[in-house]
């Protein structure tokens, strides 16, 4: 498994690679959200059913517009999300018709976050698009908190490990339904 800095990882992701990378709280697994083969590989590595859906993480909201149908949200709903970003808040928003079922699972919505983590922002800026994001662990296990855990659990299963530090968060992000305002998961 290659161990690289965020600026060196773009080609691996765009060629269908699955990576592990530090986020605000834990290591994440990620891939290109426009590559179903890469998404299926990520799901297989994590042993996660596609029906559950995944999160997209971005450096800014503009990167999410290819996936989120903002026309189904009011100005107030969008402003609430914008008031929390960048930061540890994930919003479930309506999807555009062309979004892969492997991203949204069995839902008509997708979970999205604008990250405050410098490494995640650098990855997304280098890609000029969001990154699939899910915690780096097998389904039901605790997420990885160190590069050593990634190397132990995922060597031979993923294509690269992005070097860097975890953020200051110690809890997963809060997940909020953007349409109803309902908190689906309390985090931070």
UniProtKB/Swiss-Prot annotation:
Residues 3-188 form the YrdC-like domain. GO terms for biological process: regulation of translational fidelity; tRNA threonylcarbamoyladenosine modification. Its EC number is 2.7.7.87. Its main location: cytoplasm. It comes from the Bacteria. GO terms for cellular component: cytoplasm. InterPro entries: DHBP_synth_RibB-like_a/b_dom, Sua5-like_dom, TC-AMP_synthase, TC-AMP_synthase_SUA5. Gene3D superfamilies: DHBP synthase (3.90.870.10). It catalyses: L-threonine + hydrogencarbonate + ATP = L-threonylcarbamoyladenylate + diphosphate + H2O. One of its GO terms (molecular function) is ATP binding. It is found in: Cytoplasm. It is an enzyme of class 2 (transferase). Keywords: ATP-binding, Cytoplasm, Nucleotide-binding, Nucleotidyltransferase, Transferase, tRNA processing. Required for the formation of a threonylcarbamoyl group on adenosine at position 37 (t(6)A37) in tRNAs that read codons beginning with adenine. Catalyzes the conversion of L-threonine, HCO(3)(-)/CO(2) and ATP to give threonylcarbamoyl-AMP (TC-AMP) as the acyladenylate intermediate, with the release of diphosphate. Belongs to the SUA5 family. TsaC subfamily. This is Threonylcarbamoyl-AMP synthase. It comes from Shewanella baltica (strain OS195).
